[in-house]
Amino acid sequence: MGRVAQISRTAVLAAALQLADEQGLAAVTMHAVARRLHVTPMALYRHVADKDALLDGLVELLLTEYPRPSAEGRWDERLVALADGIRATARRHPAVFPLLLTRPAVTPTARRVRNAVQAALREGGLPDPEAARAERLISTAVLGFAASEAAGRFRHHDQSVIDEDFAELLRWLRRALPVPGDVP
């Protein structure tokens, strides 16, 4: 009798991410991930409850690629570093990145990122309600730009123009924040 392949949640998510990177998000099915891991589809259910849980796991995996939120450095510089990390993640995983726009940000890693952004904004002088709103608006703008770039919307422009546009977006966002301090 053959030996049963041992898999883990990490292996399941890595296989799903690799499959999406190679063939697109539509190719990510429980059967396709199982084939990639040389197991039966039922073996996956020990690690992910269903397709929605698999997609939520992919969101978690993408979020772990962001720079770890730090308390060091200026609050606005930390936000720029995070925005740059988000954009880099979108470039690495253009097929999967749109999940960040459609899946609820309720996982522990999503909350960690959201809380770090809100903490930086509070450090910059925004009170709690405004920090939460600013986080939503900033996240929407940065995720939208990164998703647009990853989807090829800007492909007819030189990369230097796209890079400058992203830097300008971040400057606009910084100027829009009602916090004390000089605008970089």
Where are these regions (language model features)?
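Basic, helix-initiating cap at the start of DNA-binding domains
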Residues: 1-32, 36-39, 49-56
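Residues in the recognition helix of alpha-helical DNA-binding motifs
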Residues: 47-48, 134
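Short, basic, alpha-helical segments at the C-terminal edge of helix-turn-helix-like DNA-binding modules
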Residues: 60-65
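Hydrophobic alpha-helical connector segments
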Residues: 67-106, 135-138
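Amphipathic alpha-helical core segments of compact helical bundles
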Residues: 139-143, 147
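C-terminal peripheral helix-coil segments that are non-catalytic and often amphipathic
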Residues: 151-184
